[in-house]
Each structure stands twice: as C-alpha cells, then as structure tokens.
Amino acid sequence: MSEVKYKRVILKLSGEALAGEKGFGINPPVIKTVAEELKDVYDMGVQIAIVVGGGNMWRGEAGAQMGMERAQADYIGMLATIMNALALQDNLESIGVPTRVQTSIEMRQIAEPYIRRKAMRHLEKRRIVIFAGGTGSPYFSTDTTAALRAAEINADAILMAKNGVDGVYSADPNKDASAVKFDTLTHLDIINKGLQVMDTTASSLSMDNDIPVVVFNLNEPGNIRKVVAGEHIGTTVRGK
C-alpha cells in the first residue's frame, strides 16, 4: 500500500457532481472521470465506500414544496440515488474496479441489501462499496447516511467531495469578497455557526463518533488522492 493517512474512507458524492455543467441527469464524461479518480485511489490500497446523492435528478424538499407528501417525495429521491449508484458501478467495473452496490431499500434483482458485516467484508476483499437509497427512511439526508455508514463500518474519515467548492468559508465567497476559508474547524463550529458543510444531524453523528470530515473540491484532478495521502487541502473538521 502507498503511504496513506486514511486507509478506509467514506466518499460523499453529491448527485450534482455527476451532472457536470448540464446541472441535471448524468453526464457520461464526468462520471467516467470520477471513476478514474477513484481507481487511482483504489490502486493505492485504500478501502473505499461511497454514499451518492440524487440531487441531479430529484430533491425531496423540492417535491414537498410542490405539494407532495414529504415522505413520498423523499422516497423518490432515494430511488434517484440508486440510479446514480448503478451508473457509477458500471463505470468503475468497466475500468477493472470490482464494485458492489448495497441499497437500504431492497431491490435484489439489481443490488444487494445493505448488510453491515457484508459491506465490511467487501472492503476487506478489495471491492468498492456504493451505499444507495439513503438511510432508507424519509427526512434523512444523504449527508446523514454518510455519517451513519462511516460510523457503522469504522471509517477513518468522511471525504465530502464538493462540486467546485474548495473548502468551508465564513460566507459564500461568490457573494462576499471578505469571506474567509477555514483550514480546520470542529464539529461544534459547524453546528454553532450554521456553516454549510452537512446538516446538523450528520454533523452531530460525526462529532459523537469522532469521525473527521474533509471538505474539498472534487473538480480539481487528483484531489481525492491528495486527501487520502494526508496532503492538506480543503477544510478538515474534527473534534468537538
């Protein structure tokens, strides 16, 4: 194994990151690039689990605002994450990376049901595991799924891959020229300051289980490799 800081990671990948500039759906060149970046990290010997969002296809909150029952809208969002997971699996396997998709909502014809011990076994057997379907319950985000699965599989860190954002700022740098980028923060800082890293439930889970979160720009080639190797990029959130 190459020298790495984090040997088992959860990569939180937003649905929007798979859409590219189109902003909706799956952009084939983009998802191919993501798969190639992951293969580079996989070849370092890192155990990789992925939680993928579905915002490139559907958002439960948006559905609720249109008058849908919130739980029903969230279930549609869970199905969107599964579509993204299957597309990512296909791209990874096409370049020789063994990959398993586990869903929190059973659909055995296309993926395994989520079983913690089986997921850990896959990682030990050098397979990438993609967790899809969120937590399987409405009202919980895929950020919370990432924190929950990270705790369950004893991940060393959660890698929050952002679409064009290179870390955590005191304000939106696109709107406020005085915005300051943070190199390090605590989980309580995130919660108390209301910083847009992950939702409060996900932050609390990460804090309670002492899981570091690294926020970085996915669009910069080689950044996933840099994070797992311990290079300081983006913003690292750890401790209380």
Swiss-Prot record:
ATP binds at K12, L13, S14, G15, G55, R59, N163, Y169, D172. It is an enzyme of class 2 (transferase). The lineage of its organism: Bacteria, Bacillati, Bacillota, Bacilli, Lactobacillales. GO terms for cellular component: cytoplasm. Keywords: Allosteric enzyme, ATP-binding, Cytoplasm, Kinase, Nucleotide-binding, Pyrimidine biosynthesis, Transferase. UMP binds at G54, D74, T135, G136, S137, P138, Y139, F140, S141, T142. GO terms for biological process: 'de novo' CTP biosynthetic process; UDP biosynthetic process. GO terms for molecular function: ATP binding; UMP kinase activity. The keyword Kinase applies. Allosterically activated by GTP. Inhibited by UTP. Pathway: Pyrimidine metabolism; CTP biosynthesis via de novo pathway; UDP from UMP (UMPK route): step 1/1. InterPro entries: AceGlu_kinase-like_sf, Asp/Glu/Uridylate_kinase, Uridylate_kinase, Uridylate_kinase_bac. Catalyzes the reversible phosphorylation of UMP to UDP. SUPFAM superfamilies: Carbamate kinase-like. It comes from Lactiplantibacillus plantarum (strain ATCC BAA-793 / NCIMB 8826 / WCFS1) (Lactobacillus plantarum). This is Uridylate kinase. Transmembrane segments: none annotated. Pfam families: AA_kinase.
